[in-house]
């Protein structure tokens, strides 16, 4: 390996950093293949991964990490690649970095976490992404002799960061019901105490509790919407139920201003299966090995009864086979 190529040039930048900044993936791969260290920083402490995160070059990000780039490496001013992507508002880059092992709860030397940076820059879509990917809203941050939670950090800055702080409250409220609460109960209690000191935050928290109560009174079979959507317990539910209850699910979602988003998954599942069923009843033949019937002679109810026993993949297979037959006939 050419040590000169691996080190910092006279202008203070490494060759790999400069090629990354240009977006020259061919040259980046060539340098990495020759053994250039992807973690060598410039004189300003920024590495190739930091600039790749800033420019949102996903292909180069993946290559750098594949060749050993430290995904949580900090700059002198405390920035990791994930913090940079949050600042730029690039959700795709955030998602890739999380896929590649970036820690959603990483605490830098200044006590800044990804959630803190999200609140500071008001990134609501990235907030949801991080919460879905394991960010801990009840994390107790330790810096020297000082400890604090995210609500304690921002409570005196409420007027400056009002909307993003309000957006975090619903996640804190439902975190009480997650399995991880057993190890985060102190952080949860400290967050709740901070929320209780602010009338606006408390108002949102009470609305959250009201919506959770509503979700316990609606459901499918013996499972409430709270269990299905908040606890994400859908393993024993027949997916045909999402079709049968689709209109009621949509109606219930319209009553949930805060937690309505938690119903998106099951409503989409219901809509998708309904579309498949509607397409499948119109096919001219049914040649799945599991079925032995004169398909065209069956009434609509009989077809739906048969289709309801099939999973989505088999229904798609039925539709595809019919489409192929039609094309062969017309061809």
Curated annotation (Swiss-Prot):
What Gene3D superfamilies does its record include?
A: Ankyrin repeat-containing domain (1.25.40.20)
Mapped ANK repeat ranges: 11-40, 44-73, 77-106, 110-139
What PROSITE patterns is this protein classified in? ANK_REP_REGION, ANK_REPEAT
- Keyword Manganese present in the record's keywords: the answer is no
Q: Please name the SMART domains in this protein's record.
A: ANK (SM00248)
Mind telling me which SUPFAM superfamilies this protein's record contains?
Ankyrin repeat
Q: Which UniProt keywords apply?
A: ANK repeat, Repeat
Question: Which Pfam family is an annotated match for this chain, by its short name?
Answer: PRANC
Keyword Repeat carried by entry: yes
Q: What is this protein called?
A: Putative ankyrin repeat protein FPV012
This protein's species is: Fowlpox virus (strain NVSL) (FPV)
């Amino acid at each position: 390996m050419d040590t000169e190529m691996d080190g910092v040039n006279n202008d203070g930048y490494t060759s790999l950093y400069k090629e990354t900044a240009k977006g020259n993936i061919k040259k980046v791969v060539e340098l990495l293949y020759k053994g250039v260290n992807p973690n060598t920083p410039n004189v300003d402490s920024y590495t190739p991964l930091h600039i790749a995160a800033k420019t949102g070059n996903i292909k180069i990000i993946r290559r750098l990490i594949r060749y050993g780039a430290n995904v949580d490496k900090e700059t002198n001013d405390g920035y990791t690649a994930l913090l940079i992507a949050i600042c730029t508002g690039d959700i795709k880059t955030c998602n890739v970095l999380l896929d590649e092992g970036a820690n959603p709860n990483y605490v830098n030397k200044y006590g800044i976490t990804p959630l803190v940076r999200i609140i500071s820059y008001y990134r609501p879509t990235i907030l949801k992404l991080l919460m879905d990917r394991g960010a801990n809203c009840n994390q107790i941050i330790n810096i020297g002799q000082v400890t604090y939670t995210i609500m304690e950090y921002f409570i005196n800055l409420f007027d400056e960061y009002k909307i993003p702080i309000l957006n975090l409250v619903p996640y804190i409220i439902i975190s009480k019901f997650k399995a991880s609460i057993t190890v985060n109960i102190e952080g949860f209690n400290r967050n709740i105490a901070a929320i209780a000191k602010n009338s606006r935050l408390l108002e949102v928290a009470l609305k959250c509790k009201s919506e959770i109560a509503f979700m316990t009174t609606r459901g499918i079979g013996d499972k409430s919407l709270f269990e299905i959507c908040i606890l994400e317990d859908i393993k024993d539910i027949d997916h045909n139920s999402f079709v049968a209850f689709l209109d009621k699910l949509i109606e219930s979602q319209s009553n949930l201003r805060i937690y309505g988003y938690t119903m998106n998954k099951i409503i989409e599942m219901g809509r998708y299966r309904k579309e498949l069923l509607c397409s499948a009843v119109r096919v001219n033949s049914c040649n799945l090995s599991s079925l032995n019937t004169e398909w065209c002679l069956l009434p609509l109810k009989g077809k739906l009864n048969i289709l309801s026993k099939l999973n989505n993949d088999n229904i798609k297979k039925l539709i595809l086979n019919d489409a192929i037959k039609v094309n062969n006939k017309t061809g």
